[in-house]
UniProtKB/Swiss-Prot annotation:
Protein name: F420-non-reducing hydrogenase vhu iron-sulfur subunit D
Group of enzyme by EC: oxidoreductase
GO molecular function: 2 iron, 2 sulfur cluster binding; metal ion binding; oxidoreductase activity
Domain of life, source organism: Archaea
């Protein structure tokens, strides 16, 4: 299997900071992750994940602020609920809900970001490629 393609929707306040710090600190993680910055994970919509799977992503994760640390107060909790709902949709579509995950981190959690990428990469390697990948 080729290296899995992982899409990460990252909060501008926290997830993006963690991803940026991981890069500037030269931390090692699979290069197959593609990070898309969103103003807040509360802006994340399940259609973003569905489109990513349609375009060939093997997994998608959302990296938001830690609980009670969201700059927009409840954005991370809204994203968490959408991810839970998205998992159900992915199971019903036969793609698999385990291909979608939510992680909470601060902007200083570079290690948490790299762990999330590694966890999702390992998960996809066990599951195999996206079943709807063209």
């Amino acid at each position: 299997m080729a290296e899995p393609v992982i899409m990460a929707f990252v909060c501008y306040q926290u997830g993006y900071g963690a991803a940026d710090l991981a890069g500037t600190s030269r931390m090692q993680y699979p290069a197959s992750v593609r990070a898309i910055r969103v103003p807040c994970t509360g802006k994340f919509d399940i259609t973003y994940a569905l489109r990513a799977f349609q375009k060939g992503a093997d997994a998608v994760f959302v990296a938001g602020u830690k609980p009670n640390e969201c700059a927009f107060e409840t954005g991370n909790f809204k994203a968490e609920e959408r991810v839970k709902f998205g998992k159900q949709i992915l199971d019903e579509l036969g793609i698999g809900g385990e291909r979608l995950e939510m992680f909470f981190m601060s902007g200083a959690d570079a290690g948490k970001f790299t762990e999330a990428v590694k966890e999702m990469t390992d998960r996809v390697k066990k599951l195999g490629p996206n079943p709807i990948k063209a």
